[in-house]
Amino acid sequence: MKDNFSFAATSRNITSSLPFDNLNATGTNESAFNCSHKPADKHLEAIPVLYYMIFVIGFAVNIVVVSLFCCQKGPKKVSSIYIFNLAVADLLLLATLPLWATYYSYRYDWLFGPVMCKVFGSFLTLNMFASIFFITCMSVDRYQSVIYPFLSQRRNPWQASYVVPLVWCMACLSSLPTFYFRDVRTIEYLGVNACIMAFPPEKYAQWSAGIALMKNILGFIIPLIFIATCYFGIRKHLLKTNSYGKNRITRDQVLKMAAAVVLAFIICWLPFHVLTFLDALTWMGIINSCEVIAVIDLALPFAILLGFTNSCVNPFLYCFVGNRFQQKLRSVFRVPITWLQGKRETMSCRKSSSLREMDTFVS
């Protein structure tokens, strides 16, 4: 199928693009299309290599998390169930990266047909939302463990069986626009068949802005509100606790880990969502500066790349930092892990209920 694309519109969207629905086809916002900068290819040459690096590292560490969960004997904790589903979402997201790396390598020429374009575009969006939603669930679960320790000790795995399907359903619903609109279109002046969001031409600007704002709200603003609120709640509660000796060390570890979760989420996803929001403003005609559009085009592929690194960081934030990680790893793979060995003293003083419950997240 062929569409008519203006040089400026195509240039803008080709360079701003790909997995997260920012690679679009045409539009009606004339002010955004009066910029005649050409697609910049040189700065994209490193992107496929970086995609493969993230794929290899992220796939390896998340496979370890899934293996630990599957080989774990006895009843599973609620937090472990969330961590497992987070790792699965990250694995599925990372599994699509080789295709998008190939897409970049061929300068946005999609080689895998329209069905694969729709499926893998939707697959990526679905698991991006699922990963973010499970990070939010983990933050809420940790908050409950600290603020309501006795109540949280009564949690049963079946409670997570209600939350997990709900999260996956929400992720599926969030990816429906991608599934509906993602398709292959021919861009004649570039000589490529691009995998794009094929919105109706007469309402292209409205759809583009709406989808961008949806990603901002569902994929960043709402999760960040929950994650940050839980962190400050944990911090306020623990700082009120009189802790001494080893109890204080545990408290400080918990606070550092909670802060690391917030910082990792912001560092990995804020650049992408800021650029996505600016892109929405250009579609709405609020931003008409060619310089701003050029910056969006240049920076967005790297912001997307930074967002993908969150899938590599998650296992270290939620699994690998624990005191019992070495024992779990050795029990699964039956090999000595000397590089993880270290002396740990047993706590001699009694912990408060909050710290004792929260210690399960650093053990």
From Swiss-Prot:
CDD domains attached to this UniProt entry: 7tmA_AT2R
Disulfide bonds: C35-C290, C117-C195
Glycan-carrying positions: N4, N13, N24, N29, N34
Modified residues annotated as Phosphoserine in this record: S354
Chain ranges on the Extracellular side, renumbered to this chain: 1-45, 105-114, 182-206, 282-294
Residues the entry annotates as binding angiotensin II: Y103, Y104, R182, Y204, K215, D279, D297
Membrane-crossing residue ranges in chain numbering: 46-70, 81-104, 115-140, 160-181, 207-232, 258-281, 295-320
Gene Ontology cellular component list: perinuclear region of cytoplasm; plasma membrane
PROSITE patterns: G_PROTEIN_RECEP_F1_1 (PS00237), G_PROTEIN_RECEP_F1_2 (PS50262)
Subcellular location: Cell membrane
An example molecular function term from Gene Ontology annotations: angiotensin type II receptor activity
Mode of membrane association: Multi-pass membrane protein
One Pfam family recorded for the sequence: 7tm_1
InterPro entries: ATII_AT2_rcpt, ATII_rcpt, CCR1-9-like, GPCR_Rhodpsn, GPCR_Rhodpsn_7TM
Region (Helix VIII): 324-333
The UniProt record lists the keyword Protein transport: no
Cytoplasmic membrane side: 71-80, 141-159, 233-257, 321-363
Alphabetically ordered keywords of this record: Cell membrane, Disulfide bond, G-protein coupled receptor, Glycoprotein, Membrane, Phosphoprotein, Receptor, Transducer, Transmembrane, Transmembrane helix
Tissue occurrence: Abundant expression in fetal tissues, immature brain, skin wound and atretic ovarian follicles.
Any GO BP annotation: positive regulation of DNA-templated transcription
Assembly notes: Interacts with MTUS1.
Role: Receptor for angiotensin II, a vasoconstricting peptide. Signals primarily via a non-canonical G-protein- and beta-arrestin independent pathways. Cooperates with MTUS1 to inhibit ERK2 activation and cell proliferation.
UniProt free text on domains: Helix VIII may act as a gatekeeper for either suppression or activation of the receptor, depending on post-translational modifications and interactions with various receptor partners. Helix VIII is found in a non-canonical position, stabilizing the active-like state, but at the same time preventing the recruitment of G-proteins or beta-arrestins. Upon switching to a membrane-bound conformation, helix VIII can support the recruitment of G proteins and beta-arrestins.
Family the UniProt entry places it in: Belongs to the G-protein coupled receptor 1 family.
Full protein name: Type-2 angiotensin II receptor
The organism's taxonomic lineage, starting at the top: Eukaryota, Metazoa, Chordata, Craniata, Vertebrata
